[in-house]
């Protein structure tokens, strides 16, 4: 077992914050405070009139945020899908100059065995971002059917052996006196069920990702946040989003593409293209940004990160 504990290093720190094109007097939202890397950098670029609101589901992130003693900063314990409600309560709807979302699980969450995110460390099988709400992974697995579990593994983990793994997990929980309650216990059941081993990837990688995404409704949260971003942002407000797996990145990419696409003007039509496309809500800023080789070497967990930036017209 690998017991390496990774120091939390904020991925694409400067690139994501630069993507916000910070105005010193602006109002910004860090939707995923985590351990505060992005928030602290944003604050360093704001004047005394600037403002930063951060949200996070994780109680430990909230505790970390409460150590920041800065009148320009405010933390709200909620999911980033609730940003529209937060803005409404603060009278800031349509006034936000930039929203940053870092969709990754933080190193402290992964490395803390008690959180149940890691298949490399033994701990209670929890996986909840907000440990005060909802079912833990163990509680959900104790009641799920083979078909439902297989669907989750296939849909959110793109796991080719989804059915086989689901059968093994549900069968174990039905036959054993004590149901699956530990991370390494689940990881071993998955490993035993998988007929083909990838030497570069632990056999439980995709399943743990899928269960975590489902337990935390991560893609639903992202969908809600994307759909509401346009109403929250001010004109020329920026959206800077870091994703860590293809499902998230696909959603972000499609959202930005769909909302930035105009119509070509048919030949001979007496209308300017700018007039025809004036209601396009977004403009994509640059190409997708990946971590540099140097960043990947310093922080291997950054390897799969993709940053996309867009601006409200």
From Swiss-Prot:
Annotated localization: Cytoplasm
Alphabetized Pfam families for the sequence: Methyltransf_5 (PF01795)
Presence of the UniProt keyword Transport in the record: no
EC number: 2.1.1.199
SUPFAM superfamilies: Putative methyltransferase TM0872, insert domain, S-adenosyl-L-methionine-dependent methyltransferases
UniProt GO cellular component terms: cytoplasm
Residues annotated for S-adenosyl-L-methionine binding in this entry: 36-38, 56, 80, 102, 109
InterPro entries noted in UniProt: RsmH (IPR002903), SAM-dep_MeTrfase_MraW_recog (IPR023397), SAM-dependent_MTases_sf (IPR029063)
UniProt cross-references to Gene3D superfamilies, sorted A to Z: Putative methyltransferase TM0872, insert domain, Vaccinia Virus protein VP39
Summary of the function given for this chain in its UniProt record: Specifically methylates the N4 position of cytidine in position 1402 (C1402) of 16S rRNA.
Annotated family: Belongs to the methyltransferase superfamily. RsmH family.
The name this protein goes by in its record: Ribosomal RNA small subunit methyltransferase H
């Amino acid at each position: 077992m690998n017991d390496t504990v990774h120091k939390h290093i904020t991925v694409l720190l400067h690139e994501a914050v630069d993507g916000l094109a910070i105005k010193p007097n602006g109002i910004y939202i860090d939707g995923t405070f985590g351990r505060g890397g992005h928030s602290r950098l944003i604050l360093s670029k704001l004047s005394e009139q600037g403002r930063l609101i951060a949200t996070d589901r994780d109680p430990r992130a909230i505790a970390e945020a409460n150590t920041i003693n800065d009148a320009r900063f405010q933390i709200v314990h909620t999911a980033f899908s609730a940003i529209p409600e937060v803005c409404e309560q603060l009278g800031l709807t349509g006034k936000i100059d930039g929203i940053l979302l870092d969709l990754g699980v933080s190193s402290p969450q992964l490395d803390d065995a008690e959180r149940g995110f890691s298949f490399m460390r033994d701990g209670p099988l929890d996986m909840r971002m907000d440990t005060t709400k909802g079912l833990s992974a163990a509680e959900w697995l104790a009641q799920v059917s083979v078909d439902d579990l297989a669907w989750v593994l296939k849909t959110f983990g793109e796991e080719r052996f989804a059915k086989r793994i689901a059968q093994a997990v549900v069968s174990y929980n039905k036959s054993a006196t004590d149901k699956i309650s530990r991370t390494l216990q689940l990881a071993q059941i998955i490993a035993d069920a998988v007929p083909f081993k990838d030497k570069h990837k632990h056999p439980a990688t995709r399943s743990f990702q899928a269960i975590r995404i489902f337990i935390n409704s991560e893609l639903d949260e992202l969908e809600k946040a994307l759909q509401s971003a346009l109403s929250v942002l001010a004109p020329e407000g920026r959206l800077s989003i870091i994703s860590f797996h293809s499902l998230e990145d696909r959603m972000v990419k499609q959202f930005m593409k769909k909302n930035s696409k105009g119509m070509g003007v048919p030949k001979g039509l007496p209308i300017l293209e700018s007039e025809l496309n004036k209601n396009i809500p977004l403009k994509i800023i640059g190409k997708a940004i990946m971590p540099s080789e140097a960043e990947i070497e310093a922080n291997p967990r950054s390897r799969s990160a993709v940053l996309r930036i867009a601006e409200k017209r």
